[in-house]
Amino acid sequence: MPQNAAPPRPDKRKPQAAGTGLKSRLAAYEILKLVASGRYLDEAMRKASGLEPRDRAFARMLVTTCLRRGGQIDAVLGVAMSKPPAGRARDAIHVMRMGVAQLLFMDTGAHAAVDSTVSLMRAAGFERMTCLLYTSDAADD
């Protein structure tokens, strides 16, 4: 590679799990969906059993923060949203809760929290909602 050439850019359509914590966040998302459907937390946590101990601990911390601070998180989201997502997009609320939890209640940097939330929205199949978040944010500027 020539000296002045920039390194290749990652494909933005495919979130990179390595180094970004996406695996632990995906596990947390799946766990939150299971808990919301009535499963016990300990039973749902089996979704994270294949993760490295550090990632498993982060997923558990993220899930428990979302559950413990759920009322506060939903109050913040209620200000930002005119109505909750419906249909298949209803599960996107878990991703948004995780993003707010990281921003307000965990020691996650703002850039990392926002980037991981957008990546997780894409990985979970909510590309259209991700675009809507971008456009509504740009309209507010």
Placement of each model-derived feature along the sequence:
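Short, well-structured alpha-helical segments
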Residues: 56, 60-63, 90-93, 97, ...
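Inter-helical turn/loop segments and adjacent helix faces that build the functional surface
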Residues: 120-128
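Contiguous, well-ordered alpha-helical segments that form the cores/surfaces of helical PPI scaffolds
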Residues: 93-104, 119
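Short, charged amphipathic recognition helices of the HTH superfamily
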Residues: 41-43, 109-118
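Short, flexible active-site-proximal loops enriched in glycine and acidic residues
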Residues: 86-93, 105-114, 127-132
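N-terminal interaction/assembly modules
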Residues: 1-83, 100
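Conserved small/polar residues in nucleotide/adenosyl-binding loops
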Residues: 134-139
